Amino acid sequence: MIRSRVNLAREVPKKAKAHLSKERRLIKEDSEFVFGTHSVKNALATRKRECRALYVQNADIHSEFEEFLNKLQYKIPIKSVNKEHLNQITACRPHNGVVLEASSLNVPTISDLLFPAGEEYNNKNGQDSPHNDLNEGKSSSSDNYPPLYVYVDGITDPQNMGAVIRSAYILGAKGILLSKKHNTFLSPVVSKASAGALEVFNISHVKNPMVFLRNSVLKGWKVIGTKPALPDNKDQIYTPHKIKTELMNEPKILVLGSEKGLRTNILTQCSHYVSIPGGDKYVDSLNVSVAAGILLYSLVN
């Protein structure tokens, strides 16, 4: 069962909170506990969160993060605690001996994409592209043209969400766009599953998904919905290779959903449809994070 705005701070047992209260006097109600080396280091480096305290398991990790903070010229308290306490504040998730107490991510909400189709995109002269001010985050391919965004709708598993974000960042998407109501909360679990990509990537919420996608098509964006190629399907369904060739020079939004498929009202807003060949009546689809990797690799490269 998915709870709205899952917060690891609220999942911490009272016993653990009591112990940490003795050490820090107070844990803020809006605190989250970011865990894992990559997620913690990226959160500290980008400072998209208010970083409040580090909890480390041993002297070696203490020294590692003390040196890391010195390089960043950033000062926050580093508290040495035992593994049991780290297990408690992370609900026994794999934390690598380090946990960061921080505020939740402040994800902006947008109504449309500012980058119109056909506009020249070139950062070599030092000018920023209009769609780069969606967020203070980054992409791994800031100079790529045409741009590709990933719109996510209906992914309620935090591991899948993290894996999609990680693939999108590594494979060169410009950013992640999320519906507010139909996805898992961007929790520290998502951050860990993304190998810390959540902390650095361009990520925005979309105010009204149907209006957003419809307006994007009108502006010239090619909105590509993922859809199984069933025999009775009347829509033209592209393979990844064919849609790459067809839309090579067009700005794109790849729309991904759960394994149940995209909602009908989202599918109707898409300008194109793509399906990865394979499967049968027993297993007819890939995990969404695997599908995301295949499609992104094809579309970006």
Swiss-Prot record:
Species annotation: Schizosaccharomyces pombe (strain 972 / ATCC 24843) (Fission yeast)
Protein name: rRNA methyltransferase 1, mitochondrial
A Pfam entry, by short name: SpoU_methylase
Function: S-adenosyl-L-methionine-dependent 2'-O-ribose methyltransferase that catalyzes the formation of the 2'-O-methylguanosine corresponding to position 2270 in S.cerevisiae 21S mitochondrial large subunit ribosomal RNA (mtLSU rRNA), a universally conserved modification in the peptidyl transferase domain of the mtLSU rRNA.
NCBIfam families, per the entry: rRNA_methyl_3 (TIGR00186)
Domain of life: Eukaryota
Region described as Disordered: spans on this chain: 121-141
Transit peptide start and end: 1-11
Localization, UniProt: Mitochondrion
Swiss-Prot/TrEMBL keywords: Methyltransferase, Mitochondrion, rRNA processing, S-adenosyl-L-methionine, Transferase, Transit peptide
SUPFAM superfamilies registered for this protein in UniProt: alpha/beta knot, L30e-like
Enzyme Commission numbers on file: 2.1.1.-
EC category name: transferase
GO molecular function: RNA binding; rRNA (guanine) methyltransferase activity; rRNA (guanine-N1-)-methyltransferase activity
PANTHER family per the UniProt record, alphabetical: RRNA METHYLTRANSFERASE 1, MITOCHONDRIAL
